[in-house]
Amino acid sequence: MAELKKGHRVFSGQLIAVFAVVESSYTLHTTMSVAQPLLDTIEPDEPLESSVNTKGPATAPVVLTPTHATQNDPESGIVGIFRQSAHPTALFFLYLFRIAAIAVYILCGWFTDNYVLSTVAVVVLLAMDFWNCRNVSGRTLVGLRFWNQVDEDGESYWVFESRDPSRPANPIDSKMFWIALYVFPLLWSVLLIVSLLKLGFAFIPIVVLALVFNITNVIGFTYADRDAKQKWATSVAGSAWGMGLGGIGGQILTGAVKKGVGRVFG
């Protein structure tokens, strides 16, 4: 019995010693973890310097949106307009004559004091623009043309020509033509007001002539465009008649189309 108690005491002492060793090891490991963070004990897979390009400057990314275009975009700006145009030559000369007439009128006083030379230059450019717009640019860009004709009885009337509706105009050509047609008369009107305010009565006849030429083209092409739309409406009604909608139904359809076009464009 005494030997059993002695063995039990020896076993208990050994067990206490083992617990003391485990506790001291745990305390040492906890102290190391607090003093040295875990991230410092983990080595990175690759050095950070290898993933950074230090040879060239960083460039800001370009974000393209429907309303944003880069400088190198071939479809942006004046170059893009001429590339999308079906008749770039006609479009070029339309704006060339109009811009040249205004530029010569504004800048002629800076380069020469000869009033006759300045007047002749502006009038020639206005005449060339009037003829080009009515006979070349209008027919080529939007498929419209007009002129005034006198019959045998001495009565004058307007004649309008329009392109076949099955061959519509290029959207860029049409847009740029109508912009030029309506914007430049406004510019000449501003120049007329400036001449009146500055009491430059010597140049008022030139501005008045420019307004006459430009407004004539505006009225002529506006009526030509309306006449073309009315012809298109008539052709649509005629095709409906040919498809079997004759009689009262065809007459009602024809009248409805004509009235609708007249209210919109008349």
UniProtKB/Swiss-Prot annotation:
Glycosylation sites: N135
Record's keyword annotation contains S-adenosyl-L-methionine: no
Example GO biological process: protein secretion
Cytoplasm keyword on record: no
UniProt keyword list: Glycoprotein, Golgi apparatus, Membrane, Transmembrane, Transmembrane helix
GO cellular component entries: Golgi membrane
Highest taxon in the source lineage: Eukaryota
Location (main, coarse): Golgi
Bilayer-crossing regions: 91-111, 113-133, 177-197, 201-221
Entry's localization field: Golgi apparatus membrane
Membrane topology note: Multi-pass membrane protein
Record family assignment: Belongs to the TVP23 family.
Annotated function: Golgi membrane protein involved in vesicular trafficking.
Protein name (Swiss-Prot/TrEMBL): Golgi apparatus membrane protein TVP23
Origin species: Laccaria bicolor (strain S238N-H82 / ATCC MYA-4686) (Bicoloured deceiver)
